[in-house]
Amino acid sequence: MESILMQFSLFGLICIIKFRKVMDRLTCLSWWIWLILGITNLTCALCVKYVGLYSLILALFLIAYDYWNLIPRKTLSNTILCIHLMIRILIILSVICTVYLTVFYIHLTILSKAGPHDSVMTSAFQASLDGGLASITKGQPLEVTHGSQITLRHTYGRACWLHSHSHMYPLRYPDGRGSSHQQQVTCYSFKDVNNWWIVKKPERNDLVVTTPSEPIKHGDIIQLVHGITSRALNSHDVAAPMTPQSQEVSCYIDYNVSMPAQNFWKVEVTNKDNTGDVWHAIQSQIRLIHVNTDYALKFSGRQLPDWGFNQHEVVADRLVDQTDSIWNVEEHRYTKSEDQKQRERELINAEMIPLQATTLSFWEKFVELQIKMLFSGQEGQNSHMYSSDPLDWPLMSRGIAYWVSNDSNVNMY
C-alpha cells in the first residue's frame, strides 16, 4: 500500500511543480493539464491512506504561495487575479470531490461480498453484504418484542457482543475492593451461544412470543434474561472491577442478603427519527438506561484479567450521552418454547432462512467507512514499555528500542 501511496504522491507533486512553471498562463493548455493531473493524483493518494493528506496540503500550500506572488505583478489586473483565484478554487474542489467520491463509489459497488475482516463495521453495514452476516440476519423478525431472543452488539468502536457466563466476579480485587460476587457480564469479541439474551416485560411471567406480539418501543421498561443461565441483567451501587468510577453490571443471583435485584432497564432508541419508536433488529440503535440509577449500559474499553477470561468490561455509567453506550440487535429470533432446555437447544442449533438483504444507501456506507478509516486504527493499540506520547517526542524524554540482542539483555536505544 505504501508503494502505491508514494507513486500517487510523487507523481502528483511532480505535476504541481510543472504547473508552477506556467502558473500565470491561464489560457495555456498545459496550465490546466498539470493542475488537474496533480490534484487528481494527490487525491488518489488520499484515497489509498489518509496520510496522503500531507502531500495534498503541501501542494495546496505551493499553489497558494504562487498565487500570492502573482498579486504584486502590474501586468495582471484585479479582474484577472480574481479569475485566477476562482478557477483555482473551482478546479481544486471539484477534482478532489469528484475523484474521492468516484473511487469510493466504485469500491463499495464492486466489493459487495462479506469478508473475514468486515466485523469492524456496524451490523447494518455487514448485513448489507452478500454472505457472512447477511446469510444469518436475512429473514429474521424485524420488531423486537416480549420473548425476543437477541444478541446485542456494541455499535461503534470495537466489535463485541453483550455476554455472560456462569462464572462470578471475585469476592475481592487485588486493590482490596469487594465485588457483589454476582454472575459476570462482559463484552465478548466472538460469536458465542452465551451472547444470547431474551427480552422480557416485567409484568409478564413467561418468555414466549404471543400472538399478537408485544413490540418494545422507545421508553419501555424491560428485563434482559440471559439465554443460557436464565439470570437477569442487573446493576447496583457496587464499583466496576476495572473502572471503579462506574457501576458493576452483572446477572443477578439471589444470595438472600440485603441486595435486592435491580434488573429493570429503559429502552431509548437513539435514531428513532429515522427508524421509528419501535425497537428494530439491525436498524435501531439503542441505549439501555438502568431504571434505579439512570446509568447507561456501557462498553468501558477495559480488558478484564484472567478471572474474566480477558474479555472486555461492561459497566453502568452516569454519562449517558456517549457512543460507547449505544448498542444494536444483530441476530434475532422469537422464543417459541417455555422449556429452558428446549430454548438452549434452539439457541445452539437454530439457523435463519435467508429472504432479503438489509440495504444501505451509498452515503450511509460512505460516511461509516470514513469514520472507521479515521478511528479504527486506534482500536486494539495497547500500551507497552516502549510506547510514547507525542509530547515525549520533542523533549526526547522516552527512548525507542532500535535493537535488542537475542542472546542477552543488551539493547540499543
Q: Where is each model-derived feature located?
A:
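Membrane-interface anchor segments at the N-terminal boundary of transmembrane helices
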Residues: 385-388, 400-413
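Residue-level signature of transmembrane alpha-helical entry/exit and packing/kink sites
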Residues: 2, 31-38, 84, 88, ...
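Lectin-like carbohydrate-binding module/patch detector with strong preference for beta-trefoil
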Residues: 108-368
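Hydrophobic alpha-helical membrane-interfacial segments at the cytosolic entry of transmembrane helices
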Residues: 40-41, 63, 74-106
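Specific aromatic-rich, kink-prone transmembrane helix
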Residues: 4-27, 34, 38-41, 66
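Hydrophobic membrane-targeting alpha-helices
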Residues: 15-19, 47, 56, 60-64, ...
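Juxtamembrane interfacial secondary-structure elements that flank transmembrane helices
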Residues: 23-24, 67-72, 105-117
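Transmembrane helices and adjacent periplasmic/lumenal helix-loop junctions
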Residues: 3, 36-63, 98
